[in-house]
Amino acid sequence: MASSMVSSAAVATVNRTPAQASMVAPFNGLKSVAAFPVTKKNNDITSVATNGGRVQCMQVWPPLGKKKFETLSYLPPLSEESLMKEVQYLLNNGWVPCLEFEPTHGFVYREHGNTPGYYDGRYWTMWKLPMFGCTDPSQVVAELEEAKKAYPEAFIRIIGFDNVRQVQCISFIAYKPASYDA
């Protein structure tokens, strides 16, 4: 009894626009030579992901001339109400609030050579002690106001520390000095 092996090369054609010339078509898996009823997949790369046809309009954040701060740093300064909500979120998660300040560099910078190191620009001075047992956001905001009076030209951030896991869970700039021009 003779057996024969049937082989057929699967050829996929992709219709591309000039903007998609450098993109790679999605992998559709191995083609089956058996005649199973299957639905034909569209090989057009625009069917993979879409944002409503506005692909040409997307932009990235400009990397030059923008200082890197903490979480929420791309937003305008927080109002007192927004700040209270952030601190309440921190407290609701069981994190210990703590204030830190930096009088000269409120952003990541390279101090120890020309290659980025984890600790470059990340050591800030702690304002007093962590606020263990704090349950009211107004206590944290009162400490923030006190730190602003003591160091009006410093960047001040609020961090939330998880004392069970021993990690910092949240950190955001709460005050930027008036001399800093965003």
From Swiss-Prot:
Its main location: plastid. Residues 1-56 form a transit peptide. GO terms for cellular component: chloroplast. Disulfide bonds: none annotated. Coiled coil: none annotated. Induction: The most highly expressed of the 6 small subunit genes. InterPro entries: RuBisCO_ssu, RuBisCO_ssu_dom, RuBisCO_ssu_N, RuBisCO_ssu_sf. It is found in: Plastid, Chloroplast. Gene3D superfamilies: Ribulose bisphosphate carboxylase, small subunit. RuBisCO catalyzes two reactions: the carboxylation of D-ribulose 1,5-bisphosphate, the primary event in carbon dioxide fixation, as well as the oxidative fragmentation of the pentose substrate. Both reactions occur simultaneously and in competition at the same active site. Although the small subunit is not catalytic it is essential for maximal activity. Heterohexadecamer of 8 large and 8 small subunits. Belongs to the RuBisCO small chain family. The basic functional RuBisCO is composed of a large chain homodimer in a 'head-to-tail' conformation. In form I RuBisCO this homodimer is arranged in a barrel-like tetramer with the small subunits forming a tetrameric 'cap' on each end of the 'barrel'. This is Ribulose bisphosphate carboxylase small subunit, chloroplastic 1.
